[in-house]
Amino acid sequence: LKLLQDVGDSGSCNLNVMCGPPNGPFQDPQTRNQAAATGKLVFTVPSGGTARCTGTLIVDAPGSFTPYLYGANHCFETAYEAFTLNVWWFFDATACSSPATPGDYVVQTGGAALLGRSQDWDWALLRLNTAPPEGVWFSGWDAATVGSGVGVESFHHPSGDLKKWSYGTTYGNVSVNFASAAGG
């Protein structure tokens, strides 16, 4: 199955989610929960091929468990991709030095409804058609502007790989137009 062969395909700037500096993601319970809100998205594109992206389960209000999934517009350009969606939860390495495929990941089937998207800002909001499995976390969010010099981190499945962790510091806001970038 090609989707399992994706393991190891991401770049070296993406750290295994089980690794990191001494204050890495699994040293802090809140950050561990945020990582548990991130899933590998696998879906069919209109041409018939299979694509992979990342999505994060988000909460809309305290106490609400409506399964809203935040992802990228370039993944969900039509409702068809959302309709065919499967989410791979807990697709994490078993240890820091292990590139092995985990045996306990859960594939959630049932698809989703595409609720909204923005090509300009490259976001998509979906609602899963079935409830996520036990142990998946609903991540909080904030629409406030992040100032310069603030530490940020991201959990994702680059190139369909096991869950990775990237972190850095903001240095102001940058606007990128990928449609006009070299190589397009």
Name each model feature, range by range.
Residues 1-184:
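Serine endopeptidase catalytic core focused on the charge-relay Asp
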